[in-house]
């Protein structure tokens, strides 16, 4: 058995250059030995558990959808708004919600205090993401942080191949 305490895990801050997107993470699964870059599923773990904290008035990430990944959220404290394909839904402590592949989503801290939540994701190898607001695609290489972001036009499958 492996055990960690959330209070002993380093909090890693992240924010966009313009400061609209701000969130901090505690990688619980990584603290338990998960190796995100490994192709060995016994080292990757079948899912990833992360604690997140977002300041008031901020968003976690741009509105996006995953090609293959599932994400399950559990709100610990604070108040937020979840943007999704059917509109917006308010969430508070105790609320759980899930997004499957190709379901665009975004979390916004609409309260006056930090919004904290857990995220459980399956983080499949070869994951890609789509950003409907900007028309961009993100393709992960070895991890979500090691990525390529592209913006292009639709083309024929065999364009440039024959």
Name each model-derived stretch:
Residues 1-46, 135-162:
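A short, N-terminal "cap"/entry segment at the start of jelly-roll beta-barrel domains
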Residues 46, 51-55, 65-84, 121-124:
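Short, conserved beta-strand element in jelly-roll/cupin
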Residues 72, 79-81, 88, 104, ...:
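Structural motif
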Residues 86-102:
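Short acidic-glycine-tyrosine-enriched beta hairpin
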């Amino acid at each position: 058995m492996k055990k960690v305490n959330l209070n002993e895990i380093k909090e890693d801050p992240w924010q966009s250059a313009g400061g609209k997107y701000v969130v901090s993470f505690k990688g619980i699964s990584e603290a338990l030995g998960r190796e995100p870059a490994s192709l060995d599923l016994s080292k990757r773990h079948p899912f990833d558990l992360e604690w997140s904290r977002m300041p008031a008035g901020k968003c976690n990430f741009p509105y996006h959808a995953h090609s293959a990944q599932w994400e399950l959220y559990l709100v610990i404290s604070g108040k937020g708004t979840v943007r999704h394909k059917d509109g917006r839904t308010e969430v508070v402590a105790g609320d759980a919600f899930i997004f499957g592949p190709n379901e665009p989503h975004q979390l916004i801290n609409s309260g006056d205090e930090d919004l904290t939540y857990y995220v459980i994701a399956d983080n499949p190898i070869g994951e890609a993401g789509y950003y409907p607001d900007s028309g961009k695609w993100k393709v992960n290489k070895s991890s979500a942080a090691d990525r390529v972001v592209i913006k292009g036009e639709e083309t024929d499958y065999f364009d440039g191949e024959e």
